[in-house]
Each structure stands twice: as structure tokens, then as C-alpha cells.
Amino acid sequence: MLTGLSMADLSAQEKEIAIVAHRGFWNCDQAGLAKNSIAGLVQAQENDFWGSEFDVNMSKDGKLLVFHDGSVEGKSIEKNLASEFEYYRLKNGEPIPTVDQYLEQAKKYPETMLVYELKVHSNKKAESKAVRLSIEKLKEYDLFYPERVMFISFSKHICKEFARLAPGFTVQYLEGDARPDELVKYGINGID
């Protein structure tokens, strides 16, 4: 699935469209039809997509995994150790990527925007920890720049935390239950 974002006007008559690969450019043979895979990220990068969106969940031991759902085959990521997911495979045979593995590949294409979706967790304490760990990882891989990454989430708390800890970054709230004037008070500068 591809998602389009419009960018600022280049001139009065000309607009540029930015294409974001949702969960990577996974819907192709080269990526093995695997969402949130390293191969899907590579395909987005090599095909010059403006950005690539990916989903992040935190395990019980504070490890960040790139996976859309909060559970894998009924096993909660948040309630289990990351090591318990090492043997699960994506549709293309890849293991579930860690954020480290994903960011290592992301570094190779500085022109590709990372659309970092931090998933909802069970409580605000866990969400705050996941935000802090996410920022630490982005800094570790020298990717913590507003031109390289934007943050999105269905959790208002996560968005507030990213806005507080990463001023100047694009932070978009995905749930439809808040008005723009409410969100802007917290530094959240986008609604998707």
C-alpha cells in the first residue's frame, strides 16, 4: 500500500507529490510481499520513494521490534522478551527486524525519509520509555534529524512525548478524536 503526502508549493503552478511506502515497498516480488521487512525498506529506497513508514513495538525487556501488530501469532510483544521472537519469520523468510537492523539499512539512503510509527502500548510509562528508547536509537545511528525522520502514532501520549523531546520534528497524531487546536498546544504539528 502506498500513501501520498503533498509537499509545500514549489511555485504557484507547480506542486511536488511525495510518495511514502506504507510498511515499506513490500507488495512486490523483490520484497517477498513482507510488510515491515528490510527488503521492503530496500525496495522503497532503491525505487526513490520520498519516505518509508514502519511500525515499532517495545518488548518486555525494552527492545524495539519492527512489526505492525502488538502480538505475533497470539504472543504479545510487550509482555514477552525480544529473544522469544527471534525464530518467527516474516512472509519472505526474514526474521522480525529489530530497530537496530532497520536503522542500519536506513542510514544507507539519506534521501529517504523515515516515517516512524510507534505503536500504542499498555500504559503511559511504557509509552514514555518506548519514546525515549526510540530517540536514543535514532541518535545512535545518526538519524535524529527533522529532515530524516518524522513520528506518527495513534497514542496521544506518545505524540506529546515526541513533541516534548524532539522539538522541531514533524509529529502526527493518527487517531481522529482530537481537534487541531488541542494538539497544537502540545507541540503536535500534524494529523493524519
Where are these regions (language model features)?
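Phosphate-group recognition and catalysis centered on beta-loop-alpha active-site segments
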Residues: 6-192
